[in-house]
């Protein structure tokens, strides 16, 4: 069976927290084995690779991630920016703002109704702060990265763009969430990937599927939420999200219609007159 017969498959990990006292090495080993059997198109690691941003923590998590064979998009989280950890991140993983694109062969492009896919990862962390921020100075760069009109477009950041239920008082949503959401809506982004709260949850906002991932390898869990990570499938008509659990279960969690998404976008329209009269959106 050729790759053209498969949907676009994305593995979403976040909040690994290597160095954390409750870090589960066996859980990480299982993830490596399962991901390598799966062979997704890309792995997105949406921040908090480490517990406190120390060099040894980064080096340990880099060994684990190097064992995963597919291409990776890796961005830091707030824990990774502690103790000047962004220096170690850059040495081991490269730029904190990065892009990965893969073009589809003609058969797969026809099957998926897209020319390829683009993943843009952006660092939402500030050193030694739990709060997140992207910043309007980064918006032109983000806009430039999504340059293929017919791609499946995915944006990744660590901090959540939309509040996550069951996570207590909301204090860590990114500070420019409104401006960023407006930008991503205008760019016709299909999927937003984030982490931070250690709770998996999903929202549909302005036609965007927002996927928050849990922690797959620690016991820093809220309520009865088990460790988990996300597997995302995109085909011509749907986006499906499966949760993988530490006990080996794989559970279908979300089905999003791509056809309905297009209808929602067309049914919700802010007029040019309104936008011209109320120029508050960051460019």
Stretch-by-stretch model annotation:
Residues 149-166:
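Short acidic, glycine-rich surface-loop motifs adjacent to enzyme active sites
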Residues 59-141, 183-185, 231:
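Extended active-site neighborhood of metal-dependent phosphoesterases/phosphodiesterases
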Residues 169-242:
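Conserved beta-sheet core of the metallophosphoesterase superfamily
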Residues 236-283:
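A short C-terminal boundary segment appended to hydrolase-like catalytic domains
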Residues 1-67, 84, 105-107, 141, ...:
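N-terminal active-site segment of His-dependent metallophosphoesterases
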Residues 19-22, 51-56, 78-87, 127-130, ...:
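Active-site environment of divalent metal-dependent phosphoester hydrolases
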Residues 12-14, 43-48, 72-78, 123, ...:
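Active-site neighborhood of phospho(di)ester-bond hydrolases with catalytic His/Asp-centered motifs
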Residues 2-11, 110-121, 147-152, 205-210:
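Beta-strand-turn-beta hairpins that frame and shape the catalytic cleft
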């Amino acid at each position: 069976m050729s790759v053209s017969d498969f949907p676009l498959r994305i593995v979403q990990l976040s909040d690994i927290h290597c160095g954390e006292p409750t870090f589960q090495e066996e859980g990480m080993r299982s993830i490596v084995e399962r991901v390598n059997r799966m062979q997704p198109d890309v792995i997105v690691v949406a921040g908090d690779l480490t517990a406190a941003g120390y060099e040894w923590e980064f080096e340990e998590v880099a060994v684990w991630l190097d064992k995963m064979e597919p291409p990776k998009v890796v961005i830091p989280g707030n824990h990774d920016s502690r103790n000047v950890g962004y220096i170690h991140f850059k040495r081991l993983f490269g730029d904190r703002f990065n892009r990965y694109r893969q073009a589809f062969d003609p058969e797969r492009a026809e099957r998926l109704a897209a020319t390829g896919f683009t993943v843009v990862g952006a660092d939402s962390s500030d050193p030694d702060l739990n709060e997140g921020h992207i910043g309007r100075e980064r918006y032109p760069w983000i806009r430039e990265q999504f340059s293929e009109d017919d791609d499946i477009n995915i944006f990744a950041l660590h901090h959540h763009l939309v509040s996550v239920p069951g996570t207590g008082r909301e204090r860590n949503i990114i500070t420019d969430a409104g401006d960023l959401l407006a930008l991503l809506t205008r760019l016709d982004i299909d999927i937003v990937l984030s982490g931070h709260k250690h709770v998996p949850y999903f929202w549909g906002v302005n036609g965007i599927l927002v996927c928050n991932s849990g922690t797959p390898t620690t016991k820093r869990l809220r309520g009865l939420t088990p460790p988990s990570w996300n597997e995302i499938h995109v085909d011509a008509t749907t986006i499906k999200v499966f949760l993988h659990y530490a006990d080996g279960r794989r559970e279908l969690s979300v089905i999003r219609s791509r056809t309905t998404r297009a209808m929602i976008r067309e049914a919700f329209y802010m007029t040019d007159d309104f936008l011209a009269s109320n120029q508050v959106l960051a460019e």
